[in-house]
């Protein structure tokens, strides 16, 4: 299993495709996706374009859909929810299709949506995703961060290192790191693994969220390691369901 990490969607190689890909947006899209599916959402359908989201959502009955999204860390006007993992509680999302667009995470999902096996990862479902991959190891795995508006993000690299650490320890001689980005992410994980929430708060996007208001509950939720058993898997382009 060859493991590579790409900081943002634009870093993903053109004209190549791995056996599997994992998309990360720790603050907060992939954490919200994991919790929504864990709490009974029928599916999460992701969009980079807001007009396409609204058109697709309009085809569903209002009683069985929710529109989730943020731009610049704040909820999009007219949407039901923003991008907070603590808001997707069972009484809100159970049985519903969630139509979601975020500043960064949905762009990375769109970039690799053609990969045959596509998953999303957050710190709360890290072990679940690792175990799922190890049951049928891909020959080549791309880990794709979301960053912030095309730039590197500390928290996504932390999660990439956290996932790679599990895979490398479990697969022993059958897994290897193939780029420097993942080597750096592994070192970052070793530095912060005993206090991931502190890393999230120190990250520039963490500082951005702090500036927008009280997000303490979000930070705790996003940093909670290996809490969930849900594995979000793409079942058709842009549509994620629980596995």
UniProtKB/Swiss-Prot annotation:
Catalytic function, reaction form: (2R)-O-phospho-3-sulfolactate + H2O = (2R)-3-sulfolactate + phosphate
Domain of life from the UniProt record: Bacteria
Protein keywords: Hydrolase, Magnesium
Family annotation (Gene3D superfamilies): ComB-like
Signal sequence residues: none
Similarity section: Belongs to the ComB family.
Protein name per its UniProtKB record: Probable 2-phosphosulfolactate phosphatase
């Amino acid at each position: 299993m060859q493991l590579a990490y790409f900081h943002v969607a634009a870093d993903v190689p053109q004209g190549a495709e791995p056996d599997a890909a994992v998309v990360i947006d720790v603050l907060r899209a992939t954490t919200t996706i994991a919790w929504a599916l864990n709490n009974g959402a029928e599916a999460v359908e992701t969009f980079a374009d807001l007009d396409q989201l609204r058109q697709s959502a309009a085809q569903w009955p209002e009683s069985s859909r929710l529109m989730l999204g943020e731009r610049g860390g704040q909820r999009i006007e007219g949407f039901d929810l923003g991008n907070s993992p603590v808001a997707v509680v069972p009484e809100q999302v159970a049985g519903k299709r969630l139509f979601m667009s975020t500043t960064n995470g949905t762009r990375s999902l769109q970039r690799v949506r053609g990969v045959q096996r596509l998953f999303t990862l957050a710190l709360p479902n890290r072990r679940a995703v690792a175990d799922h991959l190890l049951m049928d190891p891909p020959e080549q795995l791309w880990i794709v961060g979301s960053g912030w508006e095309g730039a590197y993000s500390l928290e996504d690299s932390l999660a990439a290192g956290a996932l790679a650490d599990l895979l490398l320890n479990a697969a022993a001689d059958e897994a290897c790191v193939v780029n420097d980005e993942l080597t750096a992410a592994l070192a970052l994980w070793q530095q912060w693994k005993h206090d991931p929430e502190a890393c999230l708060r120190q990250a520039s996007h963490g500082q951005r969220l702090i500036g927008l208001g009280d997000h303490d509950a979000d930070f705790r939720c996003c940093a909670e390691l290996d809490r969930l058993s849900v594995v979000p898997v793409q079942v058709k382009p842009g549509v994620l369901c629980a596995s």
